[in-house]
Amino acid sequence: MFASLALFAATKAHAATYHSQACTITGTSGPDILFGTPGRDVICGLGGSDRIDGGRGNDVLIGGAGADLLGGGEGSDLLYGGPGNDKLQGDGGNDAVYGGAGQDTIWAWDGYADRLNGGSGVDHAWKDKLDRVTEVERFG
């Protein structure tokens, strides 16, 4: 499902690939709290410092601008924080997590094989031995 996405390239062209997904749940230009459904969701926070919980299902979470908090929930999810100092947690499943620009914090010690990319900025990650990590400078 996520194979067609250029998940971890550090270029604006590839980061835009995340935004080409059709949003099924959309926030506003301000801070939002958004929850996914039990199925597959594409949740777009847009502007503001958003809190997004994907819930069950294989979801795509896009924080957008702001200091966002993204939680994938159950399922194999794709999380993209966007510009800002974001906090991202994949939760259960083989997740792909991209922090984007800013000083991001990523949690992925769930026993699944996750792919983590902090993006530009000084990023911090907690991971387990199954995870593949790029562009992260600090580990917990």
Question: PLM features: residue spans?
Answer:
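Alpha-helical transmembrane bundles and membrane-interface segments of multipass inner-membrane proteins
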Residues: 16-20, 29, 60, 78, ...
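Leucine-rich solenoid repeat scaffolds
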Residues: 107-140
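Glycine/tyrosine- and acidic-biased, solvent-exposed loop/turn segments at the edges of beta-strands
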Residues: 85, 95, 135-139
